[in-house]
């Protein structure tokens, strides 16, 4: 596959760089422009196109498929997250300091206990779904599980090592990542999914079934979502200017009060995950933290454009830019987005190859079995770091 893609890249580069004659044509490294050509003309993209070709070629040359055995595709993440505690382990004092940052759980005698009040019951329930089957394998331990959207332990604010489990973080945080509750239940609640997305196992089946053949997909970019941040505005504005290139519109969220909240337009209707599969190019933006939508988009066998690389979930590092998805800088302008989308419209084989690799990776390495495997590895290795005798907290309830 890499050999074939390499041929496509080389042939495409040769077309771009062939304009070297003296008959009014520019040299390869010059900016090829025609005074009568539209400012959005194809020749203005040549520098960007070279950049994209080179990025894809470099990424593929250095790519080594991960080992799917025993969820090892995600092993480096777990190793890095637990590294701060490797030398001296986890002490009772650390747990006491961590309690303010999340929900307190205990595993005692292969039973699970939790503080009575849970800020987000569906999220706690999703966590407990994955922990309960592992109880016969686990030693006694205290766990502080953060079910909020935002990570808690900033590396520059916290001088002490504090073990808090969170589903998502950036490089600025030292939280220990766990597979989110939303693999089972909870997640963003919208009208179409009033109790949250949940049930990754079922979505894997329904979205894949809804995926249209590549040729049948509309060759345009697509996005639906609320205006969580203005990082999404450039794509929406491009859509309004060039609806044949992009269909990107804002939907309502709980804070919506007027069209001003949807960039001075009426909110669009929400669409199911399956409806996304009609389109060849799908954009993913972060929300408050990492996007729950991200993993679902790959199941459409469409090309995923992932905006920003700051926010992570446990499985993100196994996905490689330009190999499995197209990376997009956070503050891209409408013009930059236009160039990127147009490139993949005009280089359909490259787009399809990246889309297929992205689908295969998620399908093969983010099964529910992989999620359960990661939970198992996480809790067993975490348990080995406990350096004190865990005593039952009588204020906790069995769950």
From Swiss-Prot:
GO BP annotations listed: positive regulation of Notch signaling pathway; protein O-linked glycosylation; protein O-linked glycosylation via serine
Residues annotated as site: Interaction with the consensus sequence C-X-S-X-[PA]-C in peptide substrates: 120, 227, 254
EC code(s) of this entry: 2.4.1.-
Entry keywords, A to Z: Disulfide bond, Endoplasmic reticulum, Glycoprotein, Glycosyltransferase, Secreted, Signal, Transferase
KW Disulfide bond (keyword) present: yes
Binding site for UDP-alpha-D-glucose: 224-228, 232, 271-273, 289-293
Pathway(s) this gene product operates in, as recorded in its UniProt entry: Protein modification; protein glycosylation
Region described as Interaction with the consensus sequence C-X-S-X-[PA]-C in peptide substrates: 189-194
Sites where a glycan is attached: 19, 67
SMART domains: CAP10 (SM00672)
GO cellular component: endomembrane system; endoplasmic reticulum lumen; extracellular region
InterPro entries xref list: CAP10, O-Glucosyltr/Glycosyltrsf_90
Enzyme class, spelled out: transferase
Subcellular location: Endoplasmic reticulum lumen; Secreted
Pfam hit, one: Glyco_transf_90
This protein's record includes keyword Membrane: no
Catalytic residues (positions): 149
Cystine connections: 66-73, 71-373, 118-124, 277-300
Signal peptide extent: 1-18
GO molecular function annotation: UDP-glucosyltransferase activity; UDP-xylosyltransferase activity
Function: Protein O-glucosyltransferase. Catalyzes the reaction that attaches glucose through an O-glycosidic linkage to a conserved serine residue found in the consensus sequence C-X-S-X-[PA]-C in epidermal growth factor-like repeats. Regulates Notch signaling by glucosylating Notch in the ER, glucosylation is required for the correct folding and cleavage of Notch.
Protein name: O-glucosyltransferase rumi homolog
Organism (species): Anopheles gambiae
């Amino acid at each position: 596959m890499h050999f074939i893609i390499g041929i496509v890249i080389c042939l495409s580069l040769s077309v771009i760089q062939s304009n070297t004659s003296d008959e009014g044509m520019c040299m390869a490294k010059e900016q090829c422009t025609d005074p009568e050509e539209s400012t959005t003309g194809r020749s203005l993209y040549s520098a960007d196109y070279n950049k994209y070709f080179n990025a894809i070629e470099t990424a593929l040359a250095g790519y080594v498929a991960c080992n799917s055995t025993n969820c090892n595709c995600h092993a480096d993440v777990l190793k890095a997250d637990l590294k701060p505690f490797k030398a001296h382990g986890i002490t009772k004092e650390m747990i006491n300091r961590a309690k303010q940052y999340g929900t307190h759980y205990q595993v005692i005698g292969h039973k699970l206990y939790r503080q009575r009040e849970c800020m987000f019951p569906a999220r706690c329930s999703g966590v407990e779904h994955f922990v309960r089957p592992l109880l016969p394998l686990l030693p006694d331990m205290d766990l502080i599980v953060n079910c909020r959207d935002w990570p808690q332990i900033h590396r520059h604010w916290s001088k002490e090592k504090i073990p808090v489990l969170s589903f998502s973080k950036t490089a600025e945080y030292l939280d220990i990542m766990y597979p989110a509750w939303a693999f089972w239940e909870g997640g963003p609640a919208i009208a179409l999914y009033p109790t949250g997305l949940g049930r990754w196992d079922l979505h894997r089946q329904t979205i894949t079934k809804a995926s249209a053949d590549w040729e049948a997909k509309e060759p345009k970019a697509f996005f639906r979502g609320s205006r969580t941040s203005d990082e999404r505005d450039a794509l929406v504005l491009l859509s309004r200017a060039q609806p044949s290139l992009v269909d990107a519109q804002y939907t309502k969220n709980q804070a919506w009060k007027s069209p001003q909240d949807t960039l001075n337009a009426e909110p669009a209707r929400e669409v199911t995950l399956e409806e996304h599969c009609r389109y060849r190019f799908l954009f993913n933006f972060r929300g408050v933290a990492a996007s729950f939508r991200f993993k679902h988009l790959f199941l459409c066998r469409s090309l995923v454009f992932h905006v920003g690389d700051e926010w992570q979930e446990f499985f993100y590092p196994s996905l490689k830019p330009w190999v499995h998805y197209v990376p997009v800088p956070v503050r891209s302008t409408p013009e930059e987005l236009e160039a990127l989308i147009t490139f993949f419209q005009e280089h359909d084989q490259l787009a399809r190859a990246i889309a297929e690799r992205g689908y295969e990776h998620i399908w093969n390495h983010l099964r529910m079995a992989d999620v359960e495997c990661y939970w198992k590895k996480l809790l067993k290795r975490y348990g080995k770091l406990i350096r004190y005798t865990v005593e039952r907290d009588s204020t906790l309830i069995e769950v």
